[in-house]
From Swiss-Prot:
Signal peptide: none annotated. PANTHER family: TAPASIN (PTHR23411). It comes from the Eukaryota. Glycans are attached at residues 98, 132, 177, 343, 347, 357. This is Ig heavy chain C region. Residues 40-134, 145-237, 247-347 form the Ig-like domain. It comes from Heterodontus francisci (Horn shark). Keywords: Glycoprotein, Immunoglobulin domain, Repeat. The keyword Repeat applies. InterPro entries: Ig-like_dom (IPR007110), Ig-like_dom_sf (IPR036179), Ig-like_fold (IPR013783), Ig/MHC_CS (IPR003006), Ig_C1-set (IPR003597), Immune_Resp_Modulators (IPR050380).
Amino acid sequence: SQLTITDSEVGSSKIYCEVRRGESLWIKEIPDCKGDIVHPTVILTQTSSEEITSSRFATVVCSIIDFHPEAITVNWLKDGHPMESGFVTSPACETNGNFSATSRLTVPAREWFTNTVYTCQVSHQAATQSRNITGSPDSSECNHPAIKLLPPSIEQVLLEATVTLTCVVSNAPYGVNVSWTQEQKPLKSEIAVQPGEDPDSVISTVDISTQAWLSEAVFYCVVSHQDLPTPLRDSIHKEAWKDLREPSVSVLLPPAEEISAERFLSLTCLVRGFSPREIFVKWTVNDKSVNPGNYKNTEVMAENDKSSFFIYSLLSIAAEEWASGASYSCVVGHEAIPLKIINRTVNKSSGKPSFVNISLALLDTVNSCQ
């Protein structure tokens, strides 16, 4: 025989089991079972956004703690609808007379950050508890792949037959594919590599002709991955600049008192009045390149009219080298210069710095003007 009572009736009065057989009668009092029912504590936890991005899956753990008796039912809902798969519930384990269990839900990363509500529903002794969790779309935006395109250096554009475009993909998932196209034409590019300092980024480069870059053709970096609904694309091209302005270049000699008193001297190259802002400035000594660590270029800054720019370069040299008669040249490259490169050379014999325009072909054999 079986008797079903509600939770509220447990302990409200004494319960007896009565058995008759012929003239015989047995009566048994049923012990109060109120203390035997302990409803569980239900807690939901999830993996971090970083783990979701790297593993491409979100894991939600529903912890069901300290319940008695053992019988329990766990269901998962997605936006209020029962789920048939994607979760595993472990058998209950007994500790100090009570039971605990866990249910683990796994969701693909592409579904997690879509504002979907997942519910762990726990039923125990006719009582049901529900806990909800939502993948935040705001969090996902920080972890979506992002594309940054870098143009070639102005020095490469002015001096070389080919230039390099760079595509940096941050928050890149494992196995991401990066490709390049010119308009709709696929380009052969270097395989994307992950730099050691940022394991969540990949870098892809493509070499194109300088002529193609100067033609203002449009180049696309395309990022694809199985977790992306559609490939990501970004474009880069050389911007047309109508107001070209050629820079003026002057080298300031060290003052006489500095030459006689100091072990190290400073030469200053002032480049101003140019537009657009892309420019390179470097130094040579006796027609050989100076180590970039020996000079410092300022940032390119706008002049008062806001339509042109200027930059300083400061070269530190040993006083004895200056005294030996070495020739120092400030070499400036800019697209508005007719031959692309301009060179100013000074030495200890210079009353004023000399001025030379040099072609690309002669750059490596710059001759000092006396």
